[in-house]
């Protein structure tokens, strides 16, 4: 039960860094340029820093930081492989991918 609550809070916080990404990038109609994608990718480290600045959020910083890592090392921000990616981040990655598949983009843009 303890891990479930921990994972739930990490999940709630996983995209907190997007609050600091320019709205023009978050709501862009069409694919991002390489430069825009590099800016978008910073939401992971920004989210980590937000959590680390708050003692109550600090334990949950792995969710925002590692949720875009991939088992084969092709993810970001660190290019970690399976054994080095925290389990909670792997769970969030799967949930985030599922959400991206089933949530209409117009809804996503409205909440940012």
Residues of each region from the PLM?
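Histidine- and acidic-residue-rich, metal-dependent catalytic cores
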Residues: 1-112
């Amino acid at each position: 039960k303890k891990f479930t609550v921990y994972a739930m809070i990490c999940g709630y916080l996983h995209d907190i860094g997007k609050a600091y990404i320019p709205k023009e990038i978050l709501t862009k109609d069409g694919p991002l340029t390489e430069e825009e994608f590099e800016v978008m990718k910073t939401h992971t480290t920004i989210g980590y820093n937000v959590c680390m600045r708050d003692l109550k959020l600090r334990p949950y910083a792995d969710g925002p930081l590692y949720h875009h890592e991939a088992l084969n090392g092709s993810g970001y921000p660190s290019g970690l492989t399976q054994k080095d990616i925290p389990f909670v981040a792997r769970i969030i990655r799967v949930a985030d991918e599922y959400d991206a598949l089933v949530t209409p983009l117009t809804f996503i843009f409205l909440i940012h």
